[in-house]
Amino acid sequence: MYSKSWILNALPAPLVPYCELTRVGYLPIGVLVSYLPVLVAILHVAAVARLPYDNILDSCLQWLPLCYVYSAYGCVVDDIADQDLDRKVERCQHRPLVRGAVSTTSACLFAASLASLAVFLTKTFFPDQPAVHIPVALAGSIIYPFLKRFTNFALLYLAFLYVATGLNASRTIGYDILSAPDHLLTSNLLLAAAVFIANVSVETIYMHADLEDDIKSGIGSLAVKIQGYSKPVLFLAAVAYGSLVLASGLAAEFGKWYFTGAITSALTLFTLVARVDLKNGKMCEQFFFMGNAVLMSLLAAGLYGECIA
């Protein structure tokens, strides 16, 4: 998972450690982890409101670089805060701050630059929209790494940030779902709950890659909390996810396109849980990144089908 990608190979050597801090150089698909919940939220509102195609496309394209920058900022902040913990976790000992390739001061300046870029892009793309997600995303990324030191449930907070960003993103296409008729608002909230559970599920799979190191180092995680009965908990989460996406579609009176995407997405999560070996760290990483992308993309595809049907 950590062999150098073509992105890193193409960069001048001094820039490589900074690209590594953002994780994008090693794992380009990682950007989708933050983007797809936003895409799902936008497409849901577009589908229920029957918005013009141009509005949908513009918003989806604008949020892609935004999610990239917010994700990069969060990764840098996480590495700054977790330096002492990363030294104790084998998978993280290659990171630039741990190996001394980037100083803490330089990393802080880099994070500040990314935060400034995120604010600039948000205000440029959506000058007339309330940017509530800006302080939520920026402050939330600072709070999250410290929660891991005090609780096993920091992941729930992270998943909430994804959902909250998606809700605010959906307002940038010119329709306020919070003012929609009750059945449409219900559909949106059910879908948000489903996305929350999906993110918690795949992130928990990912956290099993570091389970032994986390236990030895005293690092909190949901994987640590549910060790010994992880599979039953994840299966329950998969069932809950499937139930919520179906209920959301029924509330919004969606058609075959949505339900095709929703059902295949739910089956994907169930299959991930069934097939993953939680004691195989590499498999946990692969299932997290590829699984997250596939199950959220299927859900987004179903919603897109409703938009153009």
Swiss-Prot record:
Q: Which domain of life does the protein's organism represent?
A: Eukaryota
State its cofactor: Mg(2+)
Task: Report keywords, A-Z.
Answer: Membrane, Transferase, Transmembrane, Transmembrane helix
Q: What does the entry list under GO cellular component?
A: mitochondrial inner membrane
Instruction: State the phenotype upon gene disruption.
Output: Abolishes the production of Aspernidine A.
Gene Ontology biological-process annotations = ubiquinone biosynthetic process
Q: Its topology with respect to the membrane?
A: Multi-pass membrane protein
The family database entries (Pfam families) matched by this protein are listed as: UbiA (PF01040)
Its UniProt pathway annotation is:
Secondary metabolite biosynthesis
GO MF assignments:
4-hydroxybenzoate polyprenyltransferase activity
Which InterPro entries does the record cross-reference, listed alphabetically? Prenyltransferase, UbiA_prenyltransferase, UbiA_sf
EC code: 2.5.1.-
Q: Name the Gene3D superfamilies on file.
A: UbiA prenyltransferase (1.20.120.1780)
Please give the start and end residues of each transmembrane region. Answer: 29-49, 101-121, 125-145, 150-170, 189-209, 232-252, 254-274, 288-308
Q: Where in the cell is it found?
A: Membrane
Name the family: Belongs to the UbiA prenyltransferase family.
Q: What does this protein do?
A: Prenyltransferase; part of the gene cluster that mediates the biosynthesis of aspernidine A, a prenylated isoindolinone. The starting point of the biosynthesis of aspernidin A is the production of orsellinaldehyde by the non-reducing polyketide synthase pkfA. Hydroxylation, methylation of one of the phenol groups, and prenylation, presumably catalyzed by the prenyltransferase pkfE, would be needed to yield aspernidine D. Subsequently, the cytochrome P450 monooxygenase pkfB is responsible for hydroxylation of aspernidine D to yield aspernidine E.
Matching entries from PANTHER family are given as: 4-HYDROXYBENZOATE POLYPRENYLTRANSFERASE, MITOCHONDRIAL, PRENYLTRANSFERASES
Q: What is this protein called?
A: Prenyltransferase pkfE
